[in-house]
Amino acid sequence: MKAIILAAGLGTRFKSEKHKVLHEMLGKPIIWYVLNYIKQSNIVDIALVVSHKKESIIEALKHENVSFFEQANPKGGTADALLSAKAFFEGMDDYILVTNGDAPLVKPDTIKGMQRFLHMVEEYEKIKVGALVLSSFLPDPTGYGRIVKNGKGDVIKIVEEKEATYEQKQINEVNGGVYMFYVPYLKEAVKHLKPSEKTNELYITDIIEIMTNLGYTCRSFMASEITEIFGVNDRWELSFAESVIKMRILENLARSGVTIHSPESVYIEPDVQVELDAEIFPNVVLKGNTVIHKKAKVMNGSYLENATIKEKATVLPMSYIKNSTVEEEAIVGPMCHIRDNSVVGKGSHVGSFVELKNAKLQENVMAKHLSYLGDVNIGKKTNIGAGTVVANFDGKQKYQSYIGQKAFIGSNSLIIAPRNIGDFAFIAGGSVITKDIPPKALAIERAELKILEDKSKVKDE
């Protein structure tokens, strides 16, 4: 089976300079979700029909294995878009999936179910289905095309809302906009397409009635969820679709053994991995290729992007971690900033208002308060006092520093990179370190304290 995605529409209701299918939900463009459910259905030969702003779509999908076809007239209608890719299904004796580029909520299992249905009909009824239409029942079907059936339950046509009779408007089964056509029958049916008298467009839905008139059987297949048939036509529908996908992700994680508190407030992107017995608290954001390992906790309001949180580690509230790793049983936060390939070693603690930039902390390092540690490797069991700064930038270049194991860096110390601080070294609080400190040495660098009696400028009133 092959697949064709129709993405040639103008998308005027988005009111955007960007093509509709490139607007993002959970960090991925709409078209990514469409491609994803097709590929997860084991369909690898995929074509995309484009027109309006085609260059941006082609550029966005340059790493995808898809073929592109251009619809010369983007107002030609959905069937005209399909015919623009006629060369893609020329010579096929199989079914072809046709779906819309703005329909990201279809599930892979639904497409697989449609494929199985076609095989069952062929096996037991010994016929080819001309068209299988994804459908759903809506309590209020206003605005949707109605699925009209005969007494045997076969679909005989799809009637759009504006053309439906009163009786047809009472039908609650609606068109989901996803089709599987048997290509030999499709090629015969499109020969009989005629433009709409009202819009002069060629509609893909007209193919169903044409196939019926040619004697071909058409059927419908019920979507497992109503939301699967919802398209994305404006920014509000984009927000709704994003919330549907997000809740699917969260439900899947929860049913796989992850505790998620107040899931409506949690944001998790599709590529994020969360393992058994991990715990996610309210207002957490997990983006990119973030991985949360077993029994780890990410607490309220934390933002993680391409972060790895190892087993039993804890991210305390309001922490920001990007492109970095927190090792087993480490604690970070609250309100810390960890970035640029930093590593917090096993059992280490990085506390409030501590920033790590390309910093590598080995096991059991303590840096609990108000510090900036940039471009530095710190040995195990070293203590970093409050207010410590490793100054890594001289205005032109950044430099690397090394602090050994079991060193003690006193509060308010300033280490001017590049520096080597040896194992077991002790730096007294308030020191400015401009030289390397050998192992086991005590380093004190302070200006002499002067007390000038009666020189205070504070007036005694």
From Swiss-Prot:
Keyword Metal-binding on entry: yes
EC number: 2.7.7.23, 2.3.1.157
Positions of the UniProt region annotated as Pyrophosphorylase: 1-235
Keyword Cell wall biogenesis/degradation: yes
Principal EC category: transferase
Active site: 369 (proton acceptor)
Cofactor note: Binds 1 Mg(2+) ion per subunit.
Alphabetized SUPFAM superfamilies for the sequence: Nucleotide-diphospho-sugar transferases (SSF53448), Trimeric LpxA-like enzymes (SSF51161)
GO molecular-function terms, A-Z: glucosamine-1-phosphate N-acetyltransferase activity; magnesium ion binding; UDP-N-acetylglucosamine diphosphorylase activity
Region (Linker): 236-256
InterPro entries per record: Bifunctional_GlmU, GlmU-like, GlmU_C_LbH, NTP_transferase_dom, Nucleotide-diphossugar_trans, Trimer_LpxA-like_sf
Positions of Mg(2+) binding: 102, 233
NCBIfam families membership: glmU (TIGR01173)
UniProt protein name: Bifunctional protein GlmU
Lineage, opening ranks: Bacteria, Pseudomonadati, Aquificota, Aquificia, Aquificales
Gene, per the UniProt record: glmU
